[in-house]
Amino acid sequence: MAKESKLTAGVAAALTVVAACALCLLLPATARAQLRVGFYDTSCPNAEALVRQAVAAAFAKDAGIAAGLIRLHFHDCFVRGCDGSVLLTVNPGGGQTERDALPNNPSLRGFDVIDAAKTAVEQSCPRTVSCADIVAFAARDSISLTGSVSYQVPAGRRDGRVSNATETVDLPPPTSTAQSLTDLFKAKELSVEDMVVLSGAHTVGRSFCASFFKRVWNTSTNPATAIVDAGLSPSYAQLLRALCPSNTTQTTPITTAMDPGTPNVLDNNYYKLLPRGMGLFFSDNQLRVNPQMAALVSSFASNETLWKEKFAAAMVKMGRIQVQTGTCGEVRLNCGVVNPSLYSSSSAVELGSSAPAAVGEEGYAAS
C-alpha cells in the first residue's frame, strides 16, 4: 500500500511538472519578461566572470572557437528555443539528439568550452546557473573578443529536457532562399532586418565543403563537372573548386573561412564581400538579390558601427526565443544530460535560488 501511495505521489508530481511547463510554453511573452540583466547578482555574483574566463582561455588557444560559440547559441535558440537542448548527448525519449543531427554534426563546436564554464560555475555556485544561460554568456563573450562589441545579457533561462534531431529542420540551411529565410526567422519572431543583421556572423568562422559544393560542381554528371553559380565571382568559384575538388564527399574534413579577408574578426567585411559575389553560401547571395535585404546589406557595408549596434540588439532578441523560466525546465547539473528524476521533479525550486540538498554527486552523470 505504501508503495502504491509513493507511486501515486510520484505520478502526481510528474503531472504537475508537465502541466506547469505546458502553461509556461503557452505564455512565451511572460517567460521572456522574466529574463533580466543581473539575474545571478545575488545567487552567483561571479557567474558571468567565470564563463568569460573559460571562453578567454579557449580563445587564447584557438581564436576560431569564438565563431563556434556564437553559432552554438544560434543553433540552440532556433530549435525548441534557448534551452540548452543542443548540448544534450542523450535524448530521454530515445532517438537521435539535435547535437547528432547533420546540421550540427560534425560542424558545431564549443561544447568543451561550455562544459569547462559549467564546471567552474558549479564549483562556485552549485545547482544555480543554467547551461542555457552559459551558452548565451559565452556567445556574448565571443563577440566581445572578436569584435570589441559588448552588451548585457538578460538571464534566467531554464534548461530543457528534450532534444530531437528531427527538429533541426528549424535551422536555416545554406541553400535557403530569401523567402525561406524570411519565413524561418518570422517563425521565431525575428524580422527581415534581424535576419540580415544576424547573417553578419558569417564574417567569422569556417565551413565544410558540403555547404557550398553544389555551387561550384555539377553533381548530376559523373565525374562532377565545374560550374559557376551565377551569384559567385568566377575567381572565387575557382578558388573554392581548388579547395574542394570534385571527389569531395559529405564527410570530407576540409574547411574554408567564410570571410577570407578577416576570418577571426567580427567586422562588416561580410557585407562588403556580398556585392562582389563572395558570399560563401547560396543563402548569403540571397541577401544581395532581394531588394529589401540588399538595401540593408549596403547600409551595413558602409557603416560598421551601425551594424555592430544592431547585431548586439539582435543577439539579445534572439536569446529570448521560446525560453523556459521560473519553474519550467531545470538547472541541468551536467550540460550533456538531463538531471536525475529526484532533482528534476523538484520543480518548485526556481533558477537562481538554492536547490534541495538531497541530490548528491549522482547528478553529474557522464555525458
UniProtKB/Swiss-Prot annotation:
Annotated S-S bridges: C44-C125, C77-C82, C131-C335, C209-C244
Protein name from the UniProt record: Peroxidase 1
Binding residue positions for substrate: P172
Known glycosylation sites: N164, N218, N247, N303
Segments passing through the bilayer: none
GO biological process: hydrogen peroxide catabolic process; response to oxidative stress; response to stress
Residues annotated to bind Ca(2+) 2: T203, D259, T262, D267
Binding sites annotated in the UniProt record for heme b: H202
Entry note: cofactor: Binds 1 heme b (iron(II)-protoporphyrin IX) group per subunit. Binds 2 calcium ions per subunit.
Family: Belongs to the peroxidase family. Classical plant (class III) peroxidase subfamily.
Pfam families given in the database record: peroxidase (PF00141)
Alphabetized GO MF terms: heme binding; lactoperoxidase activity; metal ion binding; peroxidase activity
Tissue-wise expression: Expressed in the root tip meristems.
Subcellular location, principal: secreted
EC code: 1.11.1.7
Cofactor needs: heme b; Ca(2+)
Binding residues for Ca(2+) 1: D76, V79, G81, D83, S85
The gene coding this protein: PER1
Entry's Gene Ontology cellular component terms: extracellular region; plant-type cell wall; vacuole
Record's catalysed reaction(s): 2 a phenolic donor + H2O2 = 2 a phenolic radical donor + 2 H2O
Keywords for the protein's UniProt record, in alphabetical order: Calcium, Disulfide bond, Glycoprotein, Heme, Hydrogen peroxide, Iron, Metal-binding, Oxidoreductase, Peroxidase, Pyrrolidone carboxylic acid, Secreted, Signal, Vacuole
Superkingdom of source: Eukaryota
Annotated signal peptide: 1-33
Function summary: Removal of H(2)O(2), oxidation of toxic reductants, biosynthesis and degradation of lignin, suberization, auxin catabolism, response to environmental stresses such as wounding, pathogen attack and oxidative stress. These functions might be dependent on each isozyme/isoform in each plant tissue.
Residues with Pyrrolidone carboxylic acid modification: Q34
Residues marked Transition state stabilizer (site): R71
Subcellular location, record wording: Secreted; Vacuole
